[in-house]
Amino acid sequence: MPHKAPKSKLFRTRYVEDSDDETRGRSRNRSVEKSRSKSLTRSKSKSPKKSRSKSLDRSKNVKTTKSKNTNKSNKYTEEDSEDSEDSESDQDDDKSDNEQSDSELDDSESDDDETDDNESDNDKSKDNFENIIESKENDFRNIIFENINEKFAIGKFGDFEVIINRDNGYINATQLCKDCGKDYKNWNQNEKSREFVKKLSQYTGLSNTNLLTKIIGGNNVKLRGTYVHPIILTNIGNWISPTFAIKIGEWIEEWKKFSRKNTLKYYKELSKIELYSNNDKEKQIQLALQKSLGGKIEVRTKHGYVDLLTKDKIIEIKSYDNWKHALGQILAYGELYENKNKCIYLFDIPSKNEIANIKIILKKFGISLLCI
């Protein structure tokens, strides 16, 4: 007959086996939970403290439900506590790694922000620099290559050296004309030049004295003269040199080719060109003389159009500033009408004039002078 083990011993053996099975099961569960916790923490975990608290709650629940036998349960709880501590230690390490990773990410983002700020600052400074360059390219002061003093400098205008007022970019037109073999007074007294300055004053809102400034006196003679607005200087350059006038035409053509809008704008402005006021005045005088003397106006010849042709006279009408032009034209027409008296009619004669000298010159060519 087989020997039966005491009941208490069997119970104790079964309990130990059950306890071992449960212990192994719990160990597997803890291993799974531990690996899952690490995986979640490394990938997207934003709150390590939460994971830690859940793990602690789990370990506490296991301790409470499984402590039936005093000795075994004490042994079990000690083992479980050690495992919990290991789990907490691992989670703390993961937390530390995660916090370090977050810190590195923050530092990286901070560096990126600083880089963006630096790039933004660089872009702003670049824009400002480009604006400065652009403004200098549109300013006559950009041609300066040597300073005379704090207010005046020397620049290059075509093939000529010019004196520039550094405060406003105005150029000494008197000296420029002199260097080119011209007299600034001739340009300034020209009726078309006066009309030009008048229109420019209306366009810019600047008075004549602000468009044309005079420097009188001083030890340096070259600094004396009339300093003119850059737009006026272009007109003077056109008057001085036909080559310069051609260059202006080339620049305009290049500007037109740059954009179709520029071409349309050019022809639009061209269609709004007003007749030179002297042309109107010349026409009025022409009609008045025709009414008084009779004859025909604008008579066509191989040399041009005669202003007024009467039975005994050839009359050429011009402003005082253009009397030399009138002289050349009347001599040409005189070859075609040798039996008629040659006459020049001048208008807009200034108070300070050289009418007496002009009469002497005209008399040498058999030309009479009419004027009002």
Curated annotation (Swiss-Prot):
Q: Which residues form a coiled coil?
A: none
> Where in the sequence does UniProt note compositional bias of the Basic residues kind?
1-12, 37-53
Biased amino acid composition, Acidic residues: 79-120
Q: Which SMART domains match?
A: KilA-N
Stretches of Basic and acidic residues bias are at 14-36
Any idea where the KilA-N domain is?
151-255
| GO molecular function (one) | DNA binding
InterPro entries named in the record: HTH_APSES_sf, KilA/APSES_HTH, KilA_N
Q: Where is this region: Disordered?
A: 1-129
Q: What protein does this entry describe? A: Putative KilA-N domain-containing protein L32
From which source organism is this entry?
Acanthamoeba polyphaga mimivirus (APMV)
